[in-house]
Design a protein with these regions (language model features):
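Chalcogenol-based redox active-site neighborhoods
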Residues: 1-155
């Protein structure tokens, strides 16, 4: 499925977080949501990205945003990852990758010449009305959270 564009209605979802709690996009109606998709818990790039969101979490909250991370990992894997790095936001389990597909974050990847399906690191900024305000496809981790913060301030 093609990646969502700015102005699109963000697809509804209901996924479990690392504590087993069901989290729905509709829980955050009226709030700005940073929805970031990442490939795998506790891998180098994903850890740097999660820790960058952790380090700027208070600034993101002060700017009025809620951060939600999504990967195909299990709730148990998320709990271990969140605990190890003291991550203060929900990590949602999209084990069947249905939500990742709806957002266009699931697709073909290539590593060492081998092609496979997986999450392409991407972030969606969803405004309080549930519309996509900004999209970052194929995220480069370094400096990304600063870009997200700037975009939140511009909404």
């Amino acid at each position: 499925m093609a990646m969502l564009d700015v102005g699109d209605k963000a697809p509804a979802f209901s996924l479990e977080d690392q504590s087993g709690k069901t989290v729905k996009l509709s829980d955050f109606k009226g709030k700005t949501v940073v929805l970031y998709f990442y490939p795998k818990d506790d891998t180098p790039g994903c850890t740097r990205e999660a820790c960058a969101f952790r380090d700027e979490h208070s600034a993101l909250r002060k700017a009025g945003a809620v951060v939600l991370g999504v990967s195909p990992d299990s709730g148990a894997s998320h709990a271990k990852f969140a605990g190890k790095y003291d991550l203060p936001f929900p990590l949602l389990s999209d084990t069947g990758h249905a939500v990742s597909e709806k957002y266009g974050a699931w697709g073909e990847k290539s590593l060492y010449g081998r092609k496979f399906m997986g999450i392409n690191r991407s972030t969606f900024l969803i405004d309080g009305s549930g519309k996509v305000a900004r999209v970052w496809p194929k995220v480069k981790v370094d400096g990304h959270v600063d870009q997200v913060l700037q975009a939140i301030r511009e909404i």
